[in-house]
Amino acid sequence: MALKQLRIGTRASQLALWQANWVKSELEQRYPGMEVSLVKIKTIGDKILDVPLAQVGGKGLFVKEIEEAMLRGDIDIAVHSMKDVPTEFPEGLGLHCITEREDPRDAVISRGTKFADLPQGAKIGTSALRRQAQLLKVRPDMEMVIIRGNVETRINKLETEKLDAVILAAAGLKRLGFTEKVAEYLPTDLSIPAIGQGALGIECRLDNEEVKQTIDFFNHPATAYAVRAERALLWRCEGGCQVPIAAFGEVTGSDLKLVGFIASVDGKTSVRGTITGPAADCEKLGIKLAEQLLADGGHAILAEVYQREVSREKEIPV
């Protein structure tokens, strides 16, 4: 028997609310009569908008307060962008479902100019170090400008910050109806996506069987295998979502292909690798590829990145 009511915890950004409302709509269609409500929660990542996330430091910048609400019993489930979800959870909580992935690529928003045709010294707005590293590897002449804010705010910074282009996740642009602004979708071999990019995760209390059964139908096995492999790689590298680590898994039949990438922020030093194997062994594959990358130079790269960020964090009052 389905639950009579369900409370969904979500951030209050435009994209987060779209995602939570999509989950709400799917639940209401599947369980007519169920009362589904949204509980908006402000996270530390929403409060600190004038500092790059990498400098704020820590993990779970967009989920911690939501998880605290769940532990208090204020919400039943939480809907997250998978790329924001840390690889470790508070005791008693966990990721129960990973939804089918939307377009995982990065998108270029410009004045109609494709990435390769952007002028020498072009100013590029981005919120992610892994994008910055990969794009500088290809175009070291470019100037990367860290931008924050919701999707629409970042799009508008093309004009307000006098940028030549802004790079955003295609999934958010498609969900919010901004695809007409896209000049080009970057292939995943040029800009490997963030871990989990394009997928949603639904978190709940692990001991609540009724809630788990209610949301089971959201899980998309192929996406879940791919994202679990990506997250295992990130976990083994001890990385948060604000370090220049990228990974992208693709499932074909019962096989999984995983590409991983670690780089210095300026893109001058990087290591990349690929592994294939049974999708059912997704987490083992992610860990194995991570160990290969770390051994091939990734460990030294990350040690330098973390040292730099630790020194910056000390300067920031939170």
Swiss-Prot record:
Keyword RNA-binding attached: no
Modified sites of kind S-(dipyrrolylmethanemethyl)cysteine: C241
EC number in record: 2.5.1.61
A single GO molecular function term of this UniProt record: hydroxymethylbilane synthase activity
A Pfam family the protein falls into: Porphobil_deamC
Keyword match Nucleotide-binding: no
Substrates-to-products reaction catalysed: 4 porphobilinogen + H2O = hydroxymethylbilane + 4 NH4(+)
PANTHER family (alphabetical): PORPHOBILINOGEN DEAMINASE
Family: Belongs to the HMBS family.
Protein name: Porphobilinogen deaminase
Source organism per UniProt: Geotalea daltonii (strain DSM 22248 / JCM 15807 / FRC-32) (Geobacter daltonii)
